[in-house]
Regions:
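Small-residue-enriched, tightly packed secondary-structure blocks
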Residues: 23-185
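N-terminal secretory signal peptides and thylakoid transit peptides that target proteins
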Residues: 1-21
Length: 185
């Protein structure tokens, strides 16, 4: 009753391949959308935190994740997409994702920017298959523009993370453990 011929297999494989090709993001407006959001996020950050202009000028590269959405209720997770800029040019696109379990509740959205202050830190990030944010990052969380000043811009840390634009409330939120993976939008 289950007579599966080579012709049926070939037709099924061709249909699956055709269907898979329909979802290919190459040639879509995904990259342009991410770049526009990155530009908007950088302009908002520079306006709200003028001290980050000096930080950006000294950085070897900047990873901008314009919108990260975090949700947690016992188990939690976050996701966002952004671009790595070296100078004024976008060189790669990345997804940031994390998962967690434990005492947490709520949802929030925020923007974050990673400043790679040394060539080694940028090179390690770009070479890795999936880079995880850890203890070697200096975090600058701020809701007031006057608090993000000299202590951040004179830091000797190889990577500085600026987190801003938080909306919502989530207990137990952090960037630590976030994994960054290169994508093709």
């Amino acid at each position: 009753m289950n007579n599966f011929s080579r012709r049926s297999f070939a037709l099924g494989a061709a249909a699956a391949t055709t269907l898979a090709a329909c979802g290919n993001g190459i040639g879509s407006a995904g990259a342009a959308t991410i770049d526009a959001r990155v530009d908007s996020t950088l302009n908002a950050m520079y306006a709200a935190f003028p001290g980050t202009l000096d930080l950006a000028a000294r950085a070897n590269g900047i990873l901008v994740i314009p919108l990260v959405t975090e949700v947690g209720l016992g188990f939690g997770g976050s996701f966002g997409r952004g671009a790595l800029r070296v100078g004024p040019s976008t060189v790669d696109y990345y997804a940031a994702a994390s998962g967690s379990a434990g005492l947490q509740i709520g949802a929030q959205q925020f923007s974050h920017v990673l400043f790679f202050m040394t060539p080694e830190a940028l090179s390690e990030f770009r070479r890795s298959q999936g880079w995880a944010a850890g203890a070697d990052i200096e975090y600058a969380f701020s809701s007031r523009s006057d608090m993000l000043r000299a202590e951040t811009t004179t830091s000797l840390s190889p990577v500085i993370a600026v987190v801003f634009g938080q909306t919502g409330l989530r207990l137990g939120a952090t960037l630590e453990g976030t994994k960054y993976t290169r994508i093709i939008p």
